[in-house]
Swiss-Prot record:
It is an enzyme of class 3 (hydrolase). The keyword ATP-binding applies. Homohexamer. Forms an RuvA(8)-RuvB(12)-Holliday junction (HJ) complex. HJ DNA is sandwiched between 2 RuvA tetramers; dsDNA enters through RuvA and exits via RuvB. An RuvB hexamer assembles on each DNA strand where it exits the tetramer. Each RuvB hexamer is contacted by two RuvA subunits (via domain III) on 2 adjacent RuvB subunits; this complex drives branch migration. In the full resolvosome a probable DNA-RuvA(4)-RuvB(12)-RuvC(2) complex forms which resolves the HJ. This is Holliday junction branch migration complex subunit RuvB. Mg(2+) binds at residue 68. DNA binds at residues 293, 312, 317. It comes from Rhodopseudomonas palustris (strain BisA53). GO terms for molecular function: ATP binding; ATP hydrolysis activity; four-way junction DNA binding; four-way junction helicase activity. Its EC number is 3.6.4.-. ATP binds at residues 22-23, 64, 67-69, 130-132, 173, 183, 220. The RuvA-RuvB-RuvC complex processes Holliday junction (HJ) DNA during genetic recombination and DNA repair, while the RuvA-RuvB complex plays an important role in the rescue of blocked DNA replication forks via replication fork reversal (RFR). RuvA specifically binds to HJ cruciform DNA, conferring on it an open structure. The RuvB hexamer acts as an ATP-dependent pump, pulling dsDNA into and through the RuvAB complex. RuvB forms 2 homohexamers on either side of HJ DNA bound by 1 or 2 RuvA tetramers; 4 subunits per hexamer contact DNA at a time. It comes from the Bacteria. It is found in: Cytoplasm.
Length: 347
């Protein structure tokens, strides 16, 4: 995983506990994801009118976009109980059975990182989702017997950042799949402004815009940057966060105007200066940066690709003209880098 010191990591950090107060409580307060919100509102209203459990919901998208918040809102809007856990925590079938048998009628069970459920647990989950019953084997050997346990009708809300790792049988049992996308700067401005109001901090429109532009399309990062910029504003006895204070604070935190931090720039600079802009293999980059391959592929690269700084090619990673411009470097001849001795043989 990425080092916890990265302020722009979309993953949850220990200091994000303060972000709970910034979370919207209703769909009406939730900013962004317009189509997803509109559809969810219809499904929730229909289930509430029929007094039925909502169909199982699967949220798919990068970390930090509000999957957990939306799951909590679903339960709140339905007026039912909410239980939360994560895939790695449910180690065996008995753990899942304990959760399911304690649910009341129409309750919401939220499983984060649902792609990390073990196959044995998934097998128990299938009949629970489809028929609202548990099929458990009690005992071992000749004395083993199958026991069916009827469950209350419940709604399973799953969340995953890696939909490709979900098995087809599990994916097919979710009646309401919803993909969350990165937020626009305008949407993040609204989130930052609302967060400032909740925190009791004044903020100008251009101050909110400065934070939003550097938040990498991710509300979790926007909230984290807002809390740190607020510290700078308080230390300076400023009445409100304006563009100048936000720019000073974020520059001090090494988050540049494009939302790139020191690790991003180091990644791009390494390819540009050491490997002629690429192509270079991911294993080579992992060794050069002393970072695990998973951290590079799952955390560092997605935002760089999304912003058009990086291409993944069959021969390796390749910087774009946009990346060289951002670094303030001249773009080298591609022939030299494409056929040079730069180790670009790994995808």
């Amino acid at each position: 995983m990425t080092p916890p010191s990265r302020i722009v990591t979309p993953e949850r950090r220990a200091d994000d506990v303060g972000d709970t107060a910034l979370r919207p409580q209703t769909l009406a307060e939730f900013v962004g994801q317009q189509q997803a919100r509109a559809n969810l509102q219809i499904f929730i209203d229909a289930a509430r009118k029929r007094q039925e459990a909502l169909d199982h919901v699967l949220f798919v998208g990068p970390p930090g976009l509000g999957k957990t918040t939306l799951a909590q809102i679903v339960a709140r809007e339905l007026g039912v109980g909410f239980r939360a856990t994560s895939g790695p925590v449910i180690a065996k079938a008995g753990d899942l059975a304990a959760l399911l048998t304690n649910l009341e009628e129409r309750d919401v069970l939220f499983i984060d990182e649902i792609h990390r459920l073990s196959p044995a647990v998934e097998e128990v989950l299938y009949p629970a989702m489809e028929d609202f019953q548990l099929d458990l084997i009690i005992g071992e050997g000749p004395a083993a017997r199958s026991v069916k346990i009827e469950l209350s009708k419940f709604t399973l809300v799953g969340a995953t950042t890696r939909a490709g790792l979900l098995t087809n049988p599990l994916r097919d049992r979710f009646g309401i799949p919803i993909r969350l996308n990165f937020y626009t700067v305008e949407e993040l401005e609204g989130i930052v402004s609302r967060g400032a109001r909740v925190l009791g901090t004044g903020i100008t429109p251009d101050g909110a815009n400065e934070i939003a532009r550097r938040a990498r399309g991710t509300p979790r990062i926007a909230g984290r940057l807002l809390r740190r910029v607020r510290d700078f504003a308080s230390a300076a006895d400023a009445a409100a966060i304006d563009r100048r204070i936000a720019d000073h604070a974020l520059s001090a935190l090494e988050v540049d105007a494009a939302g790139l931090d020191a690790m991003d720039r180091r990644y791009l600079s390494t390819i540009a200066l050491n490997y002629g802009g690429g192509p270079v293999g991911v294993e080579t980059m992992a060794a050069a940066l002393s970072e695990p391959r998973d951290a590079i592929e799952d955390i560092i690269e997605p935002f760089l690709i999304q912003c058009g700084y990086l291409q993944r090619t069959p021969r390796g990673r390749l910087l774009t003209s946009h990346a060289f411009k951002h670094l303030g470097l001249a773009e080298p001849s591609r022939e030299a880098s494409q056929f040079g001795l730069f180790g670009g043989d790994e995808e």
